[in-house]
Every structure is written in C-alpha cells, then in structure tokens.
Amino acid sequence: MGDIPLRIYHNNRCSKSRAACQLIADRGFEVEVVDYLKTPPSRDELRALLDKLGMKPAELVRRGEAVFKENYAGRSLSDDEWLDALAAHPILIERPIVVRGERAVLGRPPEKVLELL
C-alpha cells in the first residue's frame, strides 16, 4: 500500500485540515492537495468520494455554514438533492477528506487520516 498516492480535499483556513496535512507530512508521505473551494469536485466525484467514505451525502454537510442556514436548514432533502447542494456550494463539504486508492476517511479528528497510512 506504500505506493498508493494520497489525496486530500483541503481548505487551508481549516485547522483540522491543516493538522491532517501535517500528520501526513510528519510521516514522510507525499500528498496531492486539492483546494476544493478553488477546484470543487464534480457531482460524480462527490458520489465516488461518498462511496469510498461509506457515507450518505447529508452526513458530509457542514451545517454551521451560512449557505446551509439560509438555504437548507430544516429541509428534508433526498441524497440526490444533497449531492446537488454539495456540488453547487462546495463550502458545505465537510473537511478534510483524505483518499488513498479505494478508501477514504473524513479527518475529524485529524488523527483519522492515520488509518490510511
């Protein structure tokens, strides 16, 4: 598994995301950093990430964001509707997400990323 590259969906303004990057670097691993706010994943990429995470779209939503509170709070959405919301508003995507091969983890707490190393 040592040759399988790591990718992190990262927001540098997020302390958890920075901590996850540091944990990976401290162990000598190289990682492809994707600033998902500048280069958001497509709807299909989100679906693939969710499959690797073993999560439903609603579980990946950051509910503290203004976009959530203004547009989605109190609403019951289908998985497809949540996927549309995450694709339209990448700020709603919980972070960091670290992917290695066919596995992924949500780095909350950041030490969760160690499961992939």
Which residues does each PLM region occupy?
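General structural signal for secondary-structure boundaries
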Residues: 1-3, 42-43
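Thiol/selenol-based redox catalytic cores and closely related redox-interacting motifs
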Residues: 36-117
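Local sequence-structure signature of Cys/Sec-based thiol-disulfide redox active-site neighborhoods
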Residues: 2-27, 31-36
